[in-house]
Amino acid sequence: MSRAKRKIEHIQHALSTADQGASGFDDITFVHQSLPDVRMNDIHLHTALGELSLSSPFFINAMTGGGGKQTFEINKGLAEAAKHCRIAMAVGSQTSALRDNKQRGTFEIVRKVNKNGIIFANIGSEATVDDAKRAVDMIEADGLQIHLNVVQELVMPEGDRDFTGVLLRIEQIVQAVQVPVIVKEVGFGMSKETASRLEEVGVKIIDVGGLGGTNFARIENKRRSNIITYFNDWGIPTAASIVEVAQTSPSLVVIGSGGVRTALDAAKAIALGASAVGMAGPLLRTLVEQGVEALVASIEELHHDLTLIMGALGAKTIDKLQRVPLVIRGDTHHWLTERGFDTKVYSCR
């Protein structure tokens, strides 16, 4: 099967496959503050990912590209919304365009629409330094995502089976490209062990891509004749993954993604240690079903709601939101305790 056809199948299955709701955000409860001592007009949403300054912690995470007209139109619509709302955007894997010049336009449209926006290029862990540079140049990217998707590849009928040398390639890319590198998972979460190894080779930004959002094991299983059921619920829930990375490697910048559906989810992700939050599935569904205007309205509502939540917590900035007290309970508390983390760090600060 061609990469272009596979991209279309991924979009179709992503739209028809519901998020599994296992992100762990329901286990997080904020400690209410009756004297927040803030003026709502003083609250702002600016944040930073390393050297990149963002006007909002929300960004459109990697989804698609390389599937002809349909993915061209999706990326065009996403870019229009990102431009209007002044938020960053990542494109989907550019491997298809690196192999087939005819697919370049499905990615280049993002920069054409949003000439001054912050845009992230995207490659797989099998990519070379040359691939990385070409992907960045293709869309004049401000940052580069390298996605880790071992489980997806294992379930994918035509997926890769050689995962050696990945860390070395990442190290070489980090040293060679002139933009910040973000290493991300695609729905299975990042462990403290993985975060430490990535930090050792110079990675400074990690997108945990946790369990709870778009499930690529389920998507790939829909393309199989013999289903591999044991990978359908595989992974680290997003809430736990954020803590694993943030608490193990405090110098790393963390992005929370995977099952972020609401401003409350986003606030919880930030309070656990994320500096930004990526959203994909809910935004894709809104765009495809209702159009660009509805997507813009949805993003603006997220901004409005996050501001209200920050007001209730007395947090004027994203930095202050990262330090508000919260209580972790349920499965997330159990996971973190078993993994050696003290959740009182969050409840008593």
UniProtKB/Swiss-Prot annotation:
Record's SMART domains? IMPDH
Swiss-Prot/TrEMBL cofactor(s)? FMN; NADPH; Mg(2+)
Q: Name a single GO cellular component.
A: cytoplasm
Q: Which reaction does it catalyse?
A: isopentenyl diphosphate = dimethylallyl diphosphate
Q: What class of enzyme is it?
A: isomerase
Which positions are annotated as binding substrate?
Answer: R6, K7, Q152
Instruction: Give the EC number(s) under which this enzyme is classified.
Output: 5.3.3.2
Please state where this protein is localized.
Answer: Cytoplasm
Biological process, per Gene Ontology? isoprenoid biosynthetic process
One GO MF term on file is: NADPH binding
- Chief site of localization: cytoplasm
Cross-referenced CDD domains: IDI-2_FMN
Residues binding FMN, per UniProt:
A62, M63, T64, S93, N122, K184, T214, G259, V260, R261, A280, G281
Q: Which domain of life is it from?
A: Bacteria
What residues bind Mg(2+), as annotated? E153
| Keyword set, alphabetical order | Cytoplasm, Flavoprotein, FMN, Isomerase, Isoprene biosynthesis, Magnesium, Metal-binding, NADP
Annotated HAMAP family: Idi_2 (MF_00354)
Q: What does the annotation say about its assembly with partners?
A: Homooctamer. Dimer of tetramers.
Known role: Involved in the biosynthesis of isoprenoids. Catalyzes the 1,3-allylic rearrangement of the homoallylic substrate isopentenyl (IPP) to its allylic isomer, dimethylallyl diphosphate (DMAPP).
The text of the family note is: Belongs to the IPP isomerase type 2 family.
What name is this protein filed under?
Answer: Isopentenyl-diphosphate delta-isomerase
